[in-house]
Amino acid sequence: CYYHMRSQKTPPPATPPSWFDSEMWTGPSPMRPYTELTHPRSWRSFMEYSKGIIGDMCVHMLDTVRWILELGWPKRISSSGGILVQTEALANTPDTQNATFAFDDLNVLWSHRSWGTAPDPEYPWGATIYGDKGTLKLSVHRWDFIPRQGDPVHADVTFELDEYPEDKT
């Protein structure tokens, strides 16, 4: 799941900085008016530059789940969503999207929305794996295992945070 990241702003067109090459940035995609959202981070809010949150963030969590569970590639994928809540925003990527990745023995569900409150504030971007021995919650910063019996186990992703402390946001 993932919550937020899609910009809700509606800034007016602006003159790009002198160092910004709009042709190079846009490539073969349709040209959009430059705004404060174009660069550096909010470009993810536009289909012309990205594939939305599912193409930007889901791929990382899905790969993590596939790796942990040794799933291989999904056999089928279905998805639904759209711009259902933040209709006034300049962004044109979905503010709500759910997808089902069907594997041989199980389905992996992805859900994101860029509005509201995350159901689990400790894991606004992460994965939850429910198993017969307990539940594993994980993100790029931490993980928690909550066994059916016994005490929970928690760990932070210390190597990356020691090596790159600026990643802790």
Report the location of each language-model feature:
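Contiguous beta-strand/loop segments that form the cofactor/metal-binding neighborhood of enzyme cores
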Residues: C1-G52, D56-T169
